[in-house]
A protein has these predicted regions:
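Positively charged n-region of N-terminal signal peptides that target proteins for export
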Residues: 1-4
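Bacterial N-terminal signal peptides
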Residues: 7-16
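Sec/Tat signal peptide C-region and signal peptidase I cleavage site
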Residues: 18-22
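Primary mode marks residue(s) on the alpha4-beta5-alpha5 output face of response regulator receiver
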Residues: 23-188
């Protein structure tokens, strides 16, 4: 009974289990959409995840973009992605809840890649803190290779490159990361 009372109280206050207590729903929506292109922010669906990786809708959307605020993993990370990514993202966050150490490890481990639309976009701001977060964008291109695209497969700090070449998860990466910044922020 007491748990039910506090759960209902947190929902009335605009807070969801597993989300930072200091952030209102309005603040979470503003944070989540930071990675989205400006013209798409107001129409993006915004979701937050509980500790088991299950999504809850904070705001319904009017376009094809889904955005998520920073979660409990170390570091700062917000992301927006085309709605065809949602099954993969749900799977990835379940893997994190089950013990995958980083976002990249959870995502790279497999999952329902086949249903993501070729050409679908994903946008992210990732860093140790919000202040040092760098923007990355990726374009889904299943089974693309260096030969089929003319892109390098080595990470580049300021230019396109092909990540996970030859796999269902292959995608073109664009990063604004300055040279010398580590490949992966903590928890991502």
């Amino acid at each position: 009974m007491r748990l039910l009372f506090f759960t209902n109280l947190s929902l009335l206050l605009g807070l969801l289990p597993g989300t930072p207590m200091a952030q209102s729903v309005t603040d979470q929506i503003a944070e989540a959409t930071l990675a989205a292109p400006e013209p798409l922010r107001d129409g993006a669906r915004v979701i937050v995840r509980d500790t088991e990786g299950r999504p809850t809708i904070l705001r319904a959307g009017t376009n094809s973009l889904i955005c998520e605020p920073d979660g409990p993993q170390p570091g700062f990370g917000v992301e927006c992605y085309h709605r065809s990514f949602q099954p993969v993202m749900d799977w990835t966050y379940r893997r994190l809840a089950e013990g995958a150490r980083t976002y990249r490890e959870a995502y790279a481990d497999g999952g329902p890649e086949a249903d993501i639309n070729a050409g679908a976009m994903q946008y992210a701001l990732i860093g140790s803190t919000q202040e040092d977060a760098v923007a990355t964008m990726s374009i889904k291109l299943p089974y693309a290779t260096a030969d089929s695209t003319g892109l390098p497969t080595e990470e580049r700090s300021n230019g396109p490159w092909l990540m996970w070449a030859g796999t269902a998860a292959a995608h073109i990466m664009f990063s604004t990361k300055p040279p010398g910044v580590p490949d992966e922020s903590p928890g991502r």
